[in-house]
Amino acid sequence: MARAYEMLTVQSGDVNLAVYVSGSRRAPPLILVHGYPDSAAVWAPIRARLAKRYRVIAYDVRGAGASDAPRRRADYTLERLAGDLKAVADATCGGRPFHLVGHDWGSIQCWEAVTDPAFRGRIASYTSISGPCLDHVFRAKMRLKQSLKSWYIAFFHLPVVPSLVWRLGGAALWPRWLQITERVRAERDPVQLKNALNGMQLYRANFLARARKPRERYAQAPVQILVPVRDRYVTPEMSVDLDRWLGDHVREEIDGSHWVVLRHPDIIASRIDRFASAQERPAVANAAAQRPASAGRRLNSVS
């Protein structure tokens, strides 16, 4: 990641998170949450395009990059991850509503906050890329096509073997894998092995728990879903028929693959900006008029 940012350390419980901030302090805040096995560095192309209009905030999620890596599986639950987002937002946005963008596991974990009434009025807009809400997934009937694409989830639950794969060359060859499968030239991340090994706890701490007992989770903020149609890990069908949970929302298919944030940063940045800009003024007005009695109501009207 180019040093066009200020680096902060934010404490979330007993975990220190590395946070990278750029753009004017007066600009609308926009938080970017990365997926697996990335760090906040994956957002560099998007940051460069959005920092002229937004106060761009990205952070290494727990276990990745320069952030602390708890050892217990229980420290990687969706509840803890949503707590990290709150800590980052409190430290960087104050009481101002913020726009939120998540990719891959960053998107999955952001859904926990977006569907939490406690965040109502704080999140001005949410753009989800290649990462569904696990509660929505497991309350629907998973199609065979998606089941076949999700082989890696079962693999990451195996003992020993996944770690060996990453240690014995997987981490070193990761940029090559992205070049072959995604046609992107990713810079080598010096903490790739750390990202990969710790990030497997995200799968182990959350998938079985949500599969056993999916919850009813309704969006508390305007939602936009960007859907890469050639995603080899998440099928486009996983983001359809969500009106019950999201109300009105934006869903747009993008001609791209899973790491579309690296392959097509111009397109993704423009879609983020378009949606966030449309929601900025209503979010500020709603935040000013927000009353505690309204918390928990389902959001039914989204531009």
Predicted regions: what is each one?
Residues 2-4, 15-17, 38, 42, ...:
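Flexible "cap/lid" subdomain of the alpha/beta-hydrolase fold that forms the substrate-access gate
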Residues 20-68:
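Conserved HGGG/HGGXW glycine-rich cap/lid loop of the alpha/beta-hydrolase fold
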Residues 24-25, 91-96, 275, 279:
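Glycine-rich phosphate-binding loop signature in dinucleotide/nucleotide-binding domains
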Residues 46, 113, 238, 271-275:
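Hydrophobic residues on the short alpha-helix immediately C-terminal to a glycine-rich phosphate/catalytic loop
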Residues 85, 89, 268, 272, ...:
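Hydrophobic "lid"/C-terminal helical patch
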Residues 101, 207, 272-283:
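Short, hydrophobic alpha-helical segments
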Residues 256-269:
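Catalytic histidine-centered segment of alpha/beta-hydrolase-like enzymes
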Residues 279-303:
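Alpha/beta-hydrolase-fold serine-hydrolase catalytic core, especially in secreted/extracellular enzymes
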